[in-house]
């Protein structure tokens, strides 16, 4: 469901705090979420690629090097649908473009690396990865987002 439709539908039925997530990596994205009616923006993948994140360096680098086309959406690994970096799926010995049907009975890493596990070896990431170009301290990411938010707000006021 498009976030434009979703936030409006939620607002019709719910007067509480609405938190929007998905593909947000900048202050402009946060402003857009607020303009759609969300109270807060929930940002995930951007903060994996920070100096303080408890993720291995290869995971952070893969995020920086990826685009939205490098994301596979599947429930194969955990039983719950999720977005994963295709490169990490390949590294586990699987073809991300030809994954077997999602079924816990068919989950078998024995044909590839026997110890591959979701989140440790198969890395989650959202479709906004293509807009992440660096690994910075969290403080710098937040400061940049604040500047971007203010600049986007200024641009809207100027138009």
Where on the chain are the PLM-derived regions?
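Conserved active-site-proximal phosphate/metal-binding subdomains
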Residues: 2-19, 24-159
């Amino acid at each position: 469901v498009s976030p434009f439709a979703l936030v409006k539908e939620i607002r019709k039925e719910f007067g509480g705090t609405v938190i929007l997530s998905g593909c947000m990596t900048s202050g402009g994205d946060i402003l857009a979420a607020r303009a759609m009616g969300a109270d807060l923006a929930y940002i995930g993948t951007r903060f994996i690629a920070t100096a303080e994140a408890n993720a291995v360096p290869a995971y952070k680098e893969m995020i920086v090097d990826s685009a939205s086309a490098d994301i596979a959406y599947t429930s194969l690994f955990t039983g719950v649908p999720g977005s994963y970096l295709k490169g990490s799926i390949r590294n586990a010995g699987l073809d991300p473009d030809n994954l077997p049907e999602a079924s816990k009975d068919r989950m078998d890493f024995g044909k590839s690396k026997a110890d591959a596990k979701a989140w440790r070896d198969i890395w989650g990431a959202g479709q906004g990865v293509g807009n992440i170009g660096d690994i910075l301290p969290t403080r710098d990411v937040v400061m940049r987002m604040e500047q971007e938010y203010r600049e986007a707000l200024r641009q809207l006021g100027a138009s």
